[in-house]
């Protein structure tokens, strides 16, 4: 064995990628789980598997020049990290957000490798995106950027090579712009992107898949203690696709979601978020791109500015916003208030200390790699539908 201890290996990762703290955290989480197996397996040691799984197959970085509505040219960075294709083509989302950098995308791509393998589908892992911020941009500006982004990305993707999808800042609209440009360049209609609209090759239930899958996962977790989700109070962070559709499925199954959040703060609706209110949130976020505080004004509920919802008493907590949104203090507050189920709708939303606290308290904890894999599972179904040209019904996909 090249490394004498787990600490020595993790220290080598930090030394090699000193500025990529999110990547360090993702690697540490996985290594804690597999160290004994990897360190005591002669074949794994001989072929240095540990070093190999933390280094991507390739990292692609490119310039993305685009034009705004005033004919000014802007330049952003584009990335695609093709991390591992041991069991299938690279698969993972594209994120458009000003926080995007190499460290964040490496952590997301690394997580994606294991998440995809847990679905049982033959998919490798990758991730990509740009530091472009779609907020406040017109449709024409977003289209200009997406065309420019695909003008370079098309060289590196394909239905048997790498199949990107959406993520933060990349919904059906952005996927549509990129898919149209890819189709124009290649003169071929192939399943090279997932998350497409249902009128042009997308799958029913794809927008809902991660949120629905998260709740189904919670239901199965609770069965291990012979508990039902019906009547349980649930705190949810975020207000994007995952949070919206998690709430939708919670309502359908008889649970009571009471919070939603965004980067400005959170709302607390103690009477419960209803389907009518979720429809309002969908329009609020996807059409108006407005803040969740508008919900508080419309429904006369409490809005807590600059805070996260983990102080609210609940049975179940679903962090669905972003990485490291739930720290040790939040974890202690949750368990102190009686929360006994935490399932991650976002990627690595809990800090390492928070995860250790959940495990030590013996609550039901569902890590994101498993709990939010519903999205990539339905992406696999979309890929299959694109290959066979046979669409599936909503009931078939949700079943």
Tell where the protein language model's regions lie, with residue ranges.
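Structured beta-strand/loop patches that form or line metal/cofactor-binding pockets in enzymes
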Residues: 43-74
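Glycine/serine-rich phosphate-binding loop and adjoining beta1-alpha1 elements at the start
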Residues: 97, 116-230
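General beta-strand structural signal in soluble alpha/beta enzymes
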Residues: 161-165, 188-193, 236, 259-262, ...
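Adenosine-phosphate binding glycine-rich loop
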Residues: 2-26, 221, 335-399
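Glycine-rich phosphate/diphosphate-binding loop of Rossmann-like nucleotide-binding domains
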Residues: 194-197, 202-313
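Rossmann-fold NAD(P) dinucleotide-binding segment
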Residues: 304-314, 324-341
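N-terminal cap/recognition module
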Residues: 72-113
